[in-house]
């Protein structure tokens, strides 16, 4: 059973109103000091049953004024096992999952044993190249000349965001890995992706 909670920011605002009416001393952002435990009581009801089945919880938190350090998203980040940070990408005009601000405490378990052996290396290479594109975009905005590599990372980032990070994308893990290999092959040389040669030999799109 999947439980979707929306919007936890509104819930916290309601807690703040009740707390103020009770003349309790507010904490950061006028939120009651009990916010952490109030949220934990809800989020930590997620459970996996020994006999099978689970109750996962997905909570939606709207950022107050776009501030990720606000008390609600800040406390949520400490309690939950991971967050998907959504933002609008102006380059492709879609809402995407931001890989830099998203977090998974389970990511270290991606070893390729339950998915595909190239999974961890493809994941790390894609994020590194996407970060290189962000640096190239900063250079361009500041009026610096771009190298050929910079231009290729920018083109890669647009396709990567459109084909993999956009929230309207619906692919399984194998399909995502194959699409990413296709983008690697389209924009880079094998040595630029910094992935083991045996994996490159197996998956590089000729």
What are these regions, as identified by a protein language model?
Residues 1-205:
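P-loop NTPase catalytic core
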